Amino acid sequence: MEIRFNPMKITGVGAFGDVRGRTAAGIRSVYFILCTGYYDGLSEDIRELDRKLSTDERCIYRRVTDLPVMGVREAAEYGEKWERLCRGESVIPTETEKALKEVCSIYRSLRKNINPTIEKNFAAVLMFYSDRLLGKMTCDSGKCPKLVCSGRIGLKEYLFFHMAALMGIDVMLLCPSGLPQLPEELERVYEHIRLGEC
């Protein structure tokens, strides 16, 4: 499946709730929005977005405020899963595998001189997040998957949400205190909306 990012201009939180990523002719339209700043009615607009998308039967909606913490047992389990994936075994859905490998490639290009253990640990965290947060959020379900994060975003977190967008999930990241430190080459993927002052 080919991904086309942000086919329509999104102007705010409410507009994200109104658009639906869709698939046509083998191309998936996906919205990946990064919002910075704050305005007086933002909290109310987020509550309204939650209400609207939670009750919309055409959507699979999830809002995240904190990413889960991976324990030692899970780290070993997902690390082994990554090693099996590298050997060519099919251990995760195809779209997830494709997105994971693309994001790991981005990570390698951004973090020079990483060794296989660091990459395995990074991939393990992404697979753990995916299992815990995305679950059945696929565009194969016939519904539009939408994910909103209103927590702290660093590079690792951003790359997880980037992976979700590559899987065909509409993603909106709310960063009221400002844009996280992201490399310039990632700017082509997301649309940045300034909601107000940081």
Regions found by a protein language model. Give the residues of each.
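Conserved N-terminal ligand/cofactor-binding loop architecture of enzyme catalytic domains
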Residues: 1-14, 23-126, 185-198
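Active-site and donor-binding regions of nucleotide-sugar-utilizing enzymes
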Residues: 107-193
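Short boundary motifs at domain starts and secondary-structure transition points
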Residues: 16-26, 133-141
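Short alpha-helical segments and helix-capping/turn motifs at coil-helix boundaries
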Residues: 16-19, 45-48, 155-160
